[in-house]
């Protein structure tokens, strides 16, 4: 990181790194952060994507960080080694794989007494101690490189490391995470070449940093960059269109929901307004009736205070002048009562409340009583007429 707090990795590399990490790794955020921090601290390292073949033969596209690790700041230390660090898809749960970059490894230019020879197996894999005691919560890619650099500082061993010869093609490195051909008995004897590997389809992922100027011409390099930029632009446009469609869909749904909510509120307001009006009308009617009752009560009280009903004989008011008229009054009232009773029985019969035999029996009895009552009424009224 520079003095002004910015990373020294180019912005194009940062964008490419973020783009290729997200679909491959389970914890893309941690992988991107640790990889970017490693590239920012060690400028001799470069990122790329390659097909990694596991021990069971399963191929997988992974991020690999390659370059030269040395004890000197300028990379000119005699104890320097080209390495490739493969970041597994389960990182940081699983530690990275680190091996010697056999493409750039030259036994004639590297010291014969490599300090880390005891950690290198016959296939070129480097078994660092940190990888055996890996702690996902406390360790990262920078610590792996730092441990490798610290091991390069150690005094050299007596015997030179026995490394496999450089493979003939880059395809062999991408196809297998070795096995490689057996090491030669003498560094002066050329080992027999291994049989050519079966062809492996090229990976569809584009590498921004993995471009060798010795293998391709500047024109091809420029065309590849243009193709990469075209792919990135297409992906960007697809993402923008997808996000815009999602936002438009959600916006439409939210607008419809808001409109329905306003409609419900308007309906509830109208209902409440109607209820309030009904309550006001009912209150007005009740108040008017209360006023009428209050006025009538006042009239009754006034009449009671001014009248002399208590002094009058009640019998003189409610009783007729003769006994015959009093008897006639009672008989007429009894006749009306019998008529109402017969009509009530008839309605009960139609409703099925009483059975027919009960209706007939009770109706006959009531008719007999009514006949007698009317006969008495006729006897009383005959002399009067």
Curated annotation (Swiss-Prot):
Segments forming domain UEV: 12-161
Topology of the protein relative to the lipid bilayer: Peripheral membrane protein
UniProt feature, compositional bias: Polar residues: 168-177
SMART domains, per the entry: UBCc
Predominant cellular place of this UniProt entry's protein: cytoplasm
InterPro entries with a match to the protein in the record: ESCRT-I_UEV_domain, ESCRT_assembly_dom, SB_dom, UBQ-conjugating_enzyme/RWD, UEV_N
Coiled coil regions, renumbered to chain: 272-300
Recorded GO MF terms: ubiquitin binding
A Pfam family that the UniProt record links to this protein: UEV
Domain SB: residue ranges: 322-385
Gene Ontology cellular component list: cytoplasmic side of plasma membrane; cytosol; endosome; ESCRT I complex; late endosome membrane
Example of a GO biological process term: protein targeting to membrane
Pro residues composition-biased segments: 178-201
Annotated region (Disordered), positions in chain: 155-219
Compartment annotation: Cytoplasm; Endosome; Late endosome membrane
CDD domains the UniProt entry points to: UEV_TSG101-like
Domain notes from UniProt: The UEV domain is required for the interaction of the complex with ubiquitin.
Family as reported in the entry's similarity comment: Belongs to the ubiquitin-conjugating enzyme family. UEV subfamily.
Protein purpose: Component of the ESCRT-I complex, a regulator of vesicular trafficking process. Binds to ubiquitinated cargo proteins and is required for the sorting of endocytic ubiquitinated cargos into multivesicular bodies (MVBs). Mediates the association to the ESCRT-0 complex. Required for vacuolar targeting of temperature-sensitive plasma membrane proteins STE2 and CAN1.
PANTHER family found in the cross-reference section: TUMOR SUPPRESSOR PROTEIN 101, TUMOR SUSCEPTIBILITY GENE 101 PROTEIN-RELATED
Remaining remarks: Present with 1360 molecules/cell in log phase SD medium.
Assembly, per entry: Component of the ESCRT-I complex (endosomal sorting complex required for transport I) which consists of STP22, VPS28, SRN2 and MVB12 in a 1:1:1:1 stoichiometry. Interacts with HSE1 and VPS27. Interacts with MVB12 and SRN2.
Record protein name field: Suppressor protein STP22 of temperature-sensitive alpha-factor receptor and arginine permease
Species the sequence originates in: Saccharomyces cerevisiae (strain ATCC 204508 / S288c) (Baker's yeast)
């Amino acid at each position: 990181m520079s003095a002004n707090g910015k990373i020294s990795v180019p912005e194009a590399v940062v964008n490419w790194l973020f783009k290729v990490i997200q679909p491959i790794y389970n914890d893309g955020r941690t992988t991107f952060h640790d990889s970017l921090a490693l590239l920012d601290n060690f400028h001799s390292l470069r990122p790329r994507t390659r097909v990694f073949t596991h021990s069971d033969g399963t191929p997988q596209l992974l991020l690999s960080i390659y370059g030269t690790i040395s004890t000197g700041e300028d990379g000119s230390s005699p104890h320097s080694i080209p390495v490739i660090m493969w970041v597994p898809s389960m990182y940081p749960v699983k530690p990275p794989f680190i091996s010697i970059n056999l493409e750039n490894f030259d036994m004639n230019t590297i010291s014969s007494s490599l300090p880390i020879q005891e950690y290198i197996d016959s296939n070129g894999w480097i078994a660092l101690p940190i990888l055996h005691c890996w702690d996902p919560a406390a360790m990262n890619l920078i610590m792996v490189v730092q441990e490798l650099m610290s091991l390069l500082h150690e005094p050299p061993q007596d015997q030179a490391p026995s490394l496999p010869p450089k493979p003939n093609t880059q395809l062999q490195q991408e196809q297998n995470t070795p096995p490689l051909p057996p090491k030669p008995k003498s560094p002066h004897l050329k080992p027999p070449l291994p049989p050519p590997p079966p062809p492996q389809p090229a990976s569809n992922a584009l590498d921004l940093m993995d471009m060798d100027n010795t293998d391709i011409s500047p024109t091809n390099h420029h065309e590849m960059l243009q193709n990469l930029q075209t792919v990135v632009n297409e992906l960007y446009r697809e993402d923008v269109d997808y996000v815009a469609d999602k936002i438009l869909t959600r916006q439409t749904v939210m607008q419809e929901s808001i409109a329905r909510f306003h409609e419900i509120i308007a309906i509830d307001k109208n209902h409440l307004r109607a209820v309030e009006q009904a309550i006001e009308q009912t209150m007005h009617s009740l108040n008017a009736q209360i006023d009428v009752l209050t006025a009538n009560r006042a009239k009754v009280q006034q009449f009671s205070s001014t009248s002399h009903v208590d002094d009058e004989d009640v019998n003189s008011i409610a009783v007729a002048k003769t006994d015959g008229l009093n008897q006639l009054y009672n008989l007429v009232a009894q006749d009306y009562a019998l008529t109402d009773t017969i009509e009530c029985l008839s309605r009960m019969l139609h409703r099925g409340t009483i059975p027919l035999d009960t209706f007939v029996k009770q109706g006959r009895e009531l008719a007999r009583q009514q006949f007698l009552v009317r006969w008495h009424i006729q006897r009383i009224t005959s002399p009067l007429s």
